[in-house]
Amino acid sequence: MPISKIHARYVYDSRGNPTVEVDLVTETGLHRAIVPSGASTGQHEACELRDGDKSKWLGKGVLKAVENVNTVLGPELIKAGLDVKDQTAVDEFLIKLDGTANKTKLGANAILGVSLAVAKAGAAEKGVPLYAHVSDLAGTKKPYVLPVPFQNVLNGGSHAGGRLAFQEFMIVPSAAPSFSEGLRWGAETYHQLKSLAKKKYGQSAGNVGDEGGVAPDIQTAEEALELISEAIEKAGYTGKMKIAMDVASSEFYKEDVKKYDLDFKNPDSDPSNWLTYEQLAALYADLTKKYPIVSIEDPFAEDDWEAWSYFYKTQDIQLVADDLTVTNPIRIKKAIELKAANALLLKVNQIGTLTESIQAAKDSYADGWGVMVSHRSGETEDVTIADIVVGIRAGQIKTGAPARSERLAKLNQILRIEEELGSNAIYAGEDFRKSVTL
């Protein structure tokens, strides 16, 4: 079924920055996708095209990317007359039109908007939900797997004030009997955490960050983990609710001396307290003994390969590569060869097309890695990643706290999918690391 119209415009993301929205029309109607954007971005990811005109949107405009859809990608794709159900052919066509290694010419944000809108049109033409279409494209087996929602309830690092260096502390309801129950456990724990934070750190500690987590004036990871453990206990889930961290350590790595500065937000940070990777690894090991931590993302900097491989040998928890791999097939291959991690953080806008995202997941699965599908800190009401996580059987999703509509939009979509699939779906639960094999 041919595409009759493709039109892009700019809309705003959850941080008030412009982003790209693409409308695509076929005989089945209008299919729309909005592209997200990240705050702490890895230097190896696909190019998000921004205008750089400081007189508008502080340089973050996307008029050029929008124009690239309206004058190049759209017209050329319509002219090519490709079948919207053939996602691979469409994405290869878009990649070829751009012609650069990391989509610098037309912008990954322009290309991804078109790619995701095409996927929605393809699903509509087949008369199936998007997750079913993604499942066909990825060739995943049935039953469907519903993901464990990793809920980012406490923020530090670049996402918050206070001296806390680690960026995200997540609660993980892997022992829940279903997705909906896991989400309920998370919401109840989040409410307990919020009231504890206000009690201990004052009213403003209840304010939420970009992803809906609270950001009290906390100094150390231990202090954060104590507070979360207390909230879990108050909610009645001690022993059942697990914890995960995204350290985002590239943000506080001192490349010149190859050390990690946990006091990086203090301009007078004392270099004698900076840690070698062995010392930082020992700190993580201590924390995992003390608290029910099941997953650590970006424990080391994005090019500190030696540290990753060292830590990998000593740990059996999930080690998630985000800045290290940025969903890039070449980086993923290297991480697998160097035995640096055992799970991939999949962000569709880091690579720029649905086909490449699916391939990144498959490459990771092939080596026994887990895959966690992720939102970005600049999100929108678009829920495509909810369908992707179910379609590729990833078994884990990270999409913020159970707060702020752009985060809940994804979680609510998975609730709908759970209801629709009924007994044709299983909850990944404790098997979230190997859900693709369930």
Swiss-Prot record:
It catalyses: (2R)-2-phosphoglycerate = phosphoenolpyruvate + H2O. Mg(2+) is required for catalysis and for stabilizing the dimer. It comes from the Eukaryota. GO terms for molecular function: magnesium ion binding; phosphopyruvate hydratase activity. It holds the Pfam family Enolase_N. One of its GO terms (biological process) is glycolytic process. Its main location: cytoplasm. Pathway: Carbohydrate degradation; glycolysis; pyruvate from D-glyceraldehyde 3-phosphate: step 4/5. Its EC number is 4.2.1.11. Mg(2+) binds at D246, E297, D322. Keywords: Cytoplasm, Glycolysis, Lyase, Magnesium, Metal-binding. It is found in: Cytoplasm. The active site is at E211 (proton donor), K347 (proton acceptor). Belongs to the enolase family. PANTHER family: ENOLASE. Homodimer. This is Enolase. It comes from Cryphonectria parasitica. The lineage of its organism: Eukaryota, Fungi, Dikarya, Ascomycota, Pezizomycotina.
